[in-house]
Amino acid sequence: MSADESAPEGRRRLRELLEGVDNVIGDAAAVVDGLAPLVGLGGAEVGAQESFWAVRTFLAALAEKRPLIVWFDDVHWAEPTLLDLIEHVADWSREAPILLLCLSRPELLEERRSWGGGKLNATSMLLQPLSEERCQRLIRTLMGSNDLDPALVSRITESAAGNPLFVEQTLAALVDDGLLRREGDRWIATGNLGSVQVPPTISALLAARLDRLNMHERRVLERAAVVGQRFYLDAVVELSAPADRAGVAAHCQALVRKELVHADRSDLPGVEAFRFLHVLLRDCAYQATSKRQRAELHQGFAAWLQARMMGRPGEHDELVGYHLEQAYRYRVELGLRDTETAELGHRAAACLIEAADRVRQGDETGAAGLLKRAITLLPVTDPLRIRAEIDLGWALHSFGRFSDAERMLRQATDRAARIGDTGLRAHARLAHLRLMFATSPEGLVAETLGEATRALPIFIQNGDEVGAALACRSQAAAHMAAGRYALAERAMQAAVRHAEESGVLRDAQTMRRDLVHLLSLAPRPVGESVDRATRALAGVGDDRGLRRSLLAQLAVLFTMAGDLDAAMDHLARAEEIVWDVRSPRGDPLYGGFVVARIALLTDDLDTAEHELRRSCRRLARMGERAHLATRAAALADVLVKLERLDEAATYVSRSRDA
């Protein structure tokens, strides 16, 4: 796929690859919709599990035509979400002939211990250093000759210590020095190689190669190193002094001939790209520049990239934010704590927060990392920092890290109050109360209802539809906790309206799913709820999570209506989606409880006990108490019916304590 390719053309090519394998993929359009945002073709944001499903299904479809090898290079640099994706494909594609080949440094196994052994269908192979004989064979192969000075071959072999990069770069250094000349397919010595000094380490060797460059080539390489392992010709031109710009392209070609860089596919339309031959070369060139130069060049590249991206907002927020962040940190290290430095930090944080907003739907872990970096760039009373702390609190909550989330949200609430920002304080306080509902629910119904009711007009007056949706959702949570399901449903309907008005897709999706969970609880005839859910299911579109929730609720409703065949059919369809995206039976708050409710309604006490025990264990591990109280009470009721009164008493106590 090319950076110059249009989104419709890219989607068409993806669909072509999926032709003829309908038995594997089912819904090709859904697969393309899931892949498109991942490969830069735009489209609606999807969650991580939906993205994983799309990638896995796509690879399985390709493997249906012929065995498939997927190669991941330098996996030790991968973000956790990419590692999760690789693991997902390995775990859930066992019927497809797919080989996932991951090249990595050994330290990856410190993060993913099972990848080194013990994981099904996984094995590891440690590449040993080249033996002396193989090292010498590599030298002869690269030179195209056996007629080499034995002493030189021996010195290179000894210094390389089995590292093929060292061998390659040593021979390249001899070419740089004019001691080797190419004739046809062979390299010929131009003088006595017996006295050549071989640097003792790869770092010294690479530094020596860079020292041999002329001044202009060196400057080009140093500016390229600030851009990154892959760099853009136009960016290096922009970062160069006006008098040097005309020669940058020629110097890049000279660096290609010297095998320090090579042409690379660009991810920016209409821009020529190159890549350093090895990351160590890039690091060596980068370290040769001063901190002041790095700060200026990082800032300059961020400005160039933003100018290139005009009209395509948001696509490179993370990269722009990274370079502004580096410029800020180098200025701080130099003691330049002035207005310009503070402004750099603010701009960097804004970009990182925007990037977090973009990736949160599909990569909550990555979004949290971006927010943490943004927070460190801002003063403690900066509203932008407080907003980032609130978002990070929500992320920590979703990870089940309740104590960290509680501390972050309490801190954000206090800081927002200190600067007198009522809207920001309301956001922080409602988020804090939402968390406390899970961990310390005593006496929070009235307080949450009061806070939400006071906050709603503030949000509406400020035009803050996201805040208004949060306030209505908080009202619904309070009403649900009090058993007032009709009022809860009314509040959630308002939350959905505000979320849709906000234009924030993920918020609207979350609110719709929360509203669906009330279908089997609201006080109305079952048939009416079935009709509502059926109509909603017909118009659900490509939101697989919402489809799953609706199918699960229809399973409960049909069970209430006594139509067990329809109930089991809808439950099976819901679970097919759940397992398909590898979200373990939904989430611990709702997923398992759907099966338990159906089991309770049909007097299947063994299944009800199994599901409720599992749900209680999960909630207890998370430190969640509000739902645990309900599940423990339901389990106690099941145990009474099974005449296991001592165990029932234990769960009555757990429910009361929660």
Cite the ranges covered by each PLM segment:
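Residue register of alpha-helical TPR repeats
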Residues: 322, 350, 387, 425-429, ...
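Structural recognition of the conserved hydrophobic beta-strand(s) that form the central parallel beta-sheet
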Residues: 71, 99-104
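Conserved Walker-type P-loop NTP-binding/catalytic site
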Residues: 1-69, 97, 113-125, 130-146, ...
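Helical "lid/switch" subdomain of P-loop NTPase nucleotide-binding domains
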Residues: 10, 81-85, 104, 108
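Inter-helical turn/loop elements of alpha-helical hairpins
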Residues: 262-263, 284-461, 466, 477-490, ...
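Short secondary-structure boundary elements
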Residues: 1, 100, 122-129, 133-369, ...
